[in-house]
């Protein structure tokens, strides 16, 4: 049977337009090609990384414009201005976030203000608001979710084989949202937030929610325990996460860098077009990959579409390496993950309140004395990315009266 020539022409035109769109997008971000054909980023400074994420962030803001317009004016009262923060009175507390609540809306809004878009997480997830109990303002955010299956620096540290990783990865999580909001970030609040990963509160919450996790493939109970949490700096090397120690306890340890592979330079709108292209070809990666639709699936789907279009595999290597850290909640975490034997040693695992007190004395109060500029911060400045015409805030003296 002869194929209709018009169908072939339409497919070729679609491919040509899609290939052109990919090339033009990468060029707009400043990517070039080396003599060997490898993709080259325009640099690796923090400003360059923010610029590379700009289109992805713009898409995220646009997609959430209605939500921002409806909720920001009512939720702004939970964001602090500098003059509302009294450093020696700061009292950090954790609140776990549940879906469908105003706390969930607050988490979503706060995450949208960051210059590098955050993931929504995959699989198992625990989200937290970190409050300043002294004034009812938001200090920062924590969210942990399922880790990626392949992470070389993590796997080399633990020293497990493929079988061990498959059976014991359930005891690991990844912090996909982690950071402090202004003005607390100026007081090194990011260090406080990062230290809270290694808290008894997270360990116990995980045990309650996921302790009886059943494997998707094996359908067997995993008896999961939160032994360690990884996280990755969004800005290359992290000055916030490095040397995080309190009273001799190491809260985060740098274990190396990612290989510079990923899909952040392919925005959602372009990914959808690539996926639709695969879908029309009945490609297996278009709608699912094996037992999930997490980060590996999106990476594989994008890679598959680019390969079909004739691009090289190395188009997924953007070259931006990110520093990887691990927080070991149990002193013997790596040993248990490697061998599957032993009970977690939690003798040095403190409560969030105890950790917060140490972090306040170690970093935040001294920083407030050395750098009093945090007092100049205005909560409204956090929403500069929103058009004044689309967002109407109540007068300053009415913000405290606004009801969620």
Swiss-Prot record:
Keywords: Antiviral defense, Cytoplasm. GO terms for biological process: defense response to virus. Its main location: cytoplasm. One of its GO terms (cellular component) is cytoplasm. It is found in: Cytoplasm. Pfam families: DruA. Component of antiviral defense system Druantia type I, composed of DruA, DruB, DruC, DruD and DruE. Expression of Druantia in E.coli (strain MG1655) confers resistance to phage lambda, SECphi18, SECphi27 and T4. This is Druantia protein DruA. The gene is druA.
């Amino acid at each position: 049977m002869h194929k209709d020539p018009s169908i072939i022409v339409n497919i070729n035109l679609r491919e040509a337009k899609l290939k052109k769109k990919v090339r033009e997008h990468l060029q707009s971000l400043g990517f070039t090609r080396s003599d060997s054909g490898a993709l080259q980023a325009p640099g690796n400074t923090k400003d360059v990384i923010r610029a590379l994420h700009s289109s992805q962030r713009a898409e995220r803001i646009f997609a959430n414009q209605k939500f921002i317009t409806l909720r920001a004016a009512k939720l702004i009262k939970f964001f602090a201005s500098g003059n509302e923060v009294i450093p020696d009175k700061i009292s950090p507390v954790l609140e776990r976030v549940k879906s469908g609540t105003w706390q969930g809306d607050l988490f979503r809004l706060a995450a949208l203000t960051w210059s590098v878009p955050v993931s929504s997480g995959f699989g198992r997830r625990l989200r937290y608001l970190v409050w300043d109990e002294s004034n009812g303002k938001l200090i920062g955010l924590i969210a942990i979710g399922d880790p990626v299956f392949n992470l070389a620096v993590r796997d080399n540290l633990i020293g497990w084989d493929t079988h061990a990783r498959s059976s014991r990865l359930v005891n690991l999580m990844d912090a996909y949202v982690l950071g402090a909001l202004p003005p607390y970030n100026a007081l090194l609040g990011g260090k406080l937030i990062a230290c809270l990963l290694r808290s008894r509160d997270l360990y116990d919450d995980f045990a309650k929610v996921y302790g009886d996790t059943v494997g998707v493939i094996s359908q067997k109970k995993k008896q999961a325990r939160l032994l360690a949490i990884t996280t990755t700096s969004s800005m290359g090397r992290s000055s916030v996460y490095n040397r995080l120690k309190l009273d001799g306890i190491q809260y985060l340890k740098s274990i190396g860098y990612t290989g510079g592979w990923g899909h952040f330079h392919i925005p959602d709108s372009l990914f959808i077009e690539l996926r639709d292209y695969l879908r029309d070809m009945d490609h297996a990666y278009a709608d699912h990959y094996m037992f999930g639709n997490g980060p590996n699936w999106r990476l594989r789907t994008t890679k598959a579409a680019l390969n079909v279009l004739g691009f090289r595999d190395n188009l997924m290597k953007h070259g931006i390496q990110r520093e990887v850290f691990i927080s070991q909640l149990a002193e013997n975490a790596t040993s248990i993950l490697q061998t599957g034997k032993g009970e977690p040693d939690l003798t040095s695992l403190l409560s969030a309140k105890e950790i917060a007190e140490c972090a306040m004395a170690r970093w935040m109060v001294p920083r407030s004395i050395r750098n009093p500029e945090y007092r100049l911060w205005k909560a409204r400045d956090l929403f500069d990315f929103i058009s004044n015409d689309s967002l109407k805030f109540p007068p300053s003296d009415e913000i405290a009266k606004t009801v969620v």
